[in-house]
Amino acid sequence: MKQICLALVLVGTWILFTFCSFSQGTNIQKPIQYTLKSDFFLSTSSLPFWHYANQYNLTPKQQHFTSITQIYLNIDYQKDSLKKHTHLLGWGSEVNGIVQKSLSNKLKIVFPDFFLKLRLGSLEFWGGRRREIYGFVGDTTLTSGSFSWSSNAFPIPKIQINTLGFIDVPFTNSLLQIHATFAHGWLDTLAVDYGARVNTVKGYLHQKTLYIKIGRPSWRVNLYGGFNHQAQWGGENQIWPDGLPPKEAWWAVVIGKPWQGSRVGNHLGTLDLGMIWKLSDDKSLTFFRQNIFDDGSLYNFLNIKDGLQGVTFRNRSTPNYTRTFTLEKINLEWLNTTSQGGDVFDFQQQIFGRDNYFNHYVYPQGWSYKNEMIGTPFIPKQSDILNPLPTVKNLMTINNRVQVVHLGASGWIDEWKWLIKASFSSNLGTYDYPFPTPLKQFSGLLQIQKELPLLQGIDWTTSIAFDSGLLYEPSLGIQLGLRKRGFF
């Protein structure tokens, strides 16, 4: 009941703010985009991998039957959002309420998107929860998931300043463009597995990114490069005697300052390289590589073998329904995390192996939020893995040395839109707890979607997903969904 009341208060506040803005004498004309969506999931055991992975932790994976109803309202920037400053100022807002219900759980209401954004020229300021992905990939829909920040966990509340996409570097005539972000976020209470002073602390997130684009819009080839850096921190003055106060700890996190034989906080991210090659006006190839860093091993290129790489073909031409088959996009990726800088970690000798991705020696929940991995879903938490494998206390994952081949594709057959995902992985465990033999796993998804003309623009979606292998419980699942979009 409290959740329902809170949901009504939040939505009511958003609507009141929106319509009060409309009532001002500035002739603001900002159409509200809405989406109404309802999905039903049914499976033979727990949900198959591709019915819950990269879904922002919105589909309960341990349930045989789940229904999810979504109400999405969005006001985006408009050129007339402020009459006197057409190109300088603007505002927008978004609220996305989701109602979850399964056979064994009570009704649950969550808000994965609830934020207000303000624009000042080429800069954007926003605060709240917002669905995002960080890291250069060929396609955010077909990807296996960006390594450090995919769409796998529930959005983290943040305040952020960023550029509105790529913006021109002055005096380069669009030859150089940059895209940058800087954010502070609030994590849940973090458990502590270090020392004996405290058991829990308040957790925070630091995040920054910087990407550079080389090449003018008219060029056939554009090059990309940059990084994303995340850090999980908090409680430094509580965990360690004479520890850093919060302000000093925050600055040490921002600059990656060495401290207490390591660094303040749990740091990770990727250094990314990419290239977009325009084959024609409506077709392109994207090549990308994410190089992983986690405690300094990339500095000496010890873990250079690890990373996510791939190629994406994109066909932007308008679907021709007179054709039987149209390929829209195809994405092929290879993820490797087996090196981790080698089997040796020696801080004095500056040998930074055993990166132990997504685990941490101070914060046992590792790189996770609300009990779900923030990064790639192919490094799973312990509870997702089959029970015969041993449970290790104070480790978020016992399988962070993986190799994955992933294929995603989408297109049209007549007026039916289709999408497939197929992923094969070899799972080695961790350096400290290796599996006796590599565990093989296959996960697949086939989805079809069609607009129903008799129902005024309602889309119907059906998907079938299945898991087969030794890492997850074998499962077969089906999803049925309806979606209505429009403006008012």
How should each PLM-predicted stretch be described?
Residues 32-48, 89-99, 118, 125-131, ...:
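Transmembrane beta-barrel strands of outer-membrane/channel proteins
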Residues 162-347, 351, 405-407, 424-430, ...:
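Signature for the C-terminal beta-barrel architecture of outer-membrane proteins
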Residues 63-65, 99-109, 293-301, 398-402, ...:
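Solvent-exposed loop/turn segments connecting transmembrane beta-strands
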Residues 25-34, 75-91, 119-126, 166-179, ...:
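Short loop/turn motifs that connect adjacent beta-strands in outer-membrane beta-barrel proteins
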Residues 21-132, 141-142, 147-149, 153-166, ...:
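Beta-barrel outer-membrane channel/assembly domains of diderm bacteria
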